[in-house]
């Protein structure tokens, strides 16, 4: 699958099409579960994480562990970007992203869905899940 095909599958609109960012945000924040939130969030980054990290890890690890490691590597890349900006190495984003990966796996194992709620409530829940993981990461660092 190419990047363009992946983005079209995730967003429902072609890569770079008018309104594609808005569609991505609507899909992500209005997602009916935490798993779906991450399915829709940043499809370009998700394509490369899936292709080069998650899928290769799946050959050797359970999917839940592969996804947590992939979240951690994504966080490490974000920390690296901050370091390259001259702000020093931070490990906060790595920890935060691992927390989000754990949260996603817990919500998946519990089969948590908020499909019966309005878009607004689903967005609040999705944003809250990120905020909760952020708070937990601050306790660890």
Question: Model regions: which residues?
Answer:
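Membrane-interfacial catalytic/cofactor-binding modules of polytopic membrane enzymes
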Residues: 1-74, 116-141
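Active-site His/Glu-centered metal-binding helix of metallohydrolases
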Residues: 76, 80-81
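Extended hydrophobic/aromatic segments used for targeting, binding, or gating
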Residues: 82-118
């Amino acid at each position: 699958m190419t990047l363009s095909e992946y983005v079209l599958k995730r967003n429902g609109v072609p890569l770079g099409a008018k309104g594609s960012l808005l569609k991505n945000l609507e899909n992500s924040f209005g997602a009916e579960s935490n798993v779906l939130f991450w399915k829709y969030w940043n499809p370009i980054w998700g394509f490369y994480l899936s292709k080069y990290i998650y899928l290769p890890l799946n050959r050797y690890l359970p999917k839940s562990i592969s996804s947590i490691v992939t979240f951690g590597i994504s966080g490490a890349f974000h920390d690296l970007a901050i370091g390259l900006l001259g702000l020093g190495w931070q490990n906060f984003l790595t920890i935060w992203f691992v927390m989000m990966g754990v949260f996603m796996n817990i919500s998946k194992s519990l089969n948590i869905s908020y499909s019966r709620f309005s878009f607004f409530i689903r967005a609040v829940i999705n944003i809250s899940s990120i905020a909760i993981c952020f708070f937990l990461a601050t306790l660890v660092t």
